Amino acid sequence: MQKFNSLTSIPAYLPIVNIDTDMIIPKQFLKTIKRTGLGKNLFFEMRYDDNGNEIKDFILNQKPHNQSKILIAGKNFGCGSSREHAPWALLDFGITCVISSSYADIFYSNCFKNGILPITLPEEKIKELSEYSKRKEEISIDLNEEKIIFGNSEIKFDIDPFKKKCLLEGLDDIALSLAKKEKIITFEENLKNNKPWIFNDKN
């Protein structure tokens, strides 16, 4: 997983509430277990018409927002069914930070596991930041200092210390497990010695 320290980008503002995971990445694209290639299908039904052509009015089809790394979204973002493909699609598109006033719990957790920073802010702060999307001006995210910098102002945000550490160091579930590899091996060896009947090891 890529480390997340800081980020500067023109944000894309998508002021739609209750965007669920099926809207983020529809079910017909969930057959793959690869994390790459999903970005082109992000927000598929909002980005494309029935003939597969891009809908020009959609924010992520417009320059420079089609290169945005920061998505400002409506409340309750990522609700609906649990699918890790949702953060995969965002990440593959290039979005590594989402800003909203609220998230579905599972989606929120999945973001951290895949290197995406989900920031929670009050609605009035969301509106303030959305102006930078409209004006096509950059904002900056500083995870270490837990702040968003825009113009001559800044907004502080809160994040769980452990989740922050994982993003800063690029630690996903596999990396966290491997960090305790020696302890896991020792535990397995002790268990095998104390309760050998549990194991069916013919070697």
Swiss-Prot record:
**Taxonomically, which superkingdom?**
Bacteria
- Pathway named in the protein's UniProt entry: Amino-acid biosynthesis; L-leucine biosynthesis; L-leucine from 3-methyl-2-oxobutanoate: step 2/4
CDD domains per record: IPMI_Swivel
Extract the Pfam families matched here: Aconitase_C (PF00694)
Q: Name one GO biological process term.
A: L-leucine biosynthetic process
Q: Which E.C. number(s) belong to this protein?
A: 4.2.1.33
* GO MF, any single term: 3-isopropylmalate dehydratase activity
**Record's catalysed reaction(s):** (2R,3S)-3-isopropylmalate = (2S)-2-isopropylmalate
Q: Which UniProt keywords apply?
A: Amino-acid biosynthesis, Branched-chain amino acid biosynthesis, Leucine biosynthesis, Lyase
Question: What enzyme category does the UniProt record give?
Answer: lyase
Q: Does the keyword Lyase apply?
A: yes
User: Does the UniProt entry include the keyword Acyltransferase?
Assistant: no
* Subunit field text: Heterodimer of LeuC and LeuD.
Question: What does the similarity note say?
Answer: Belongs to the LeuD family. LeuD type 1 subfamily.
Question: Briefly, what is this protein's role?
Answer: Catalyzes the isomerization between 2-isopropylmalate and 3-isopropylmalate, via the formation of 2-isopropylmaleate.
Supply the name of the protein: 3-isopropylmalate dehydratase small subunit
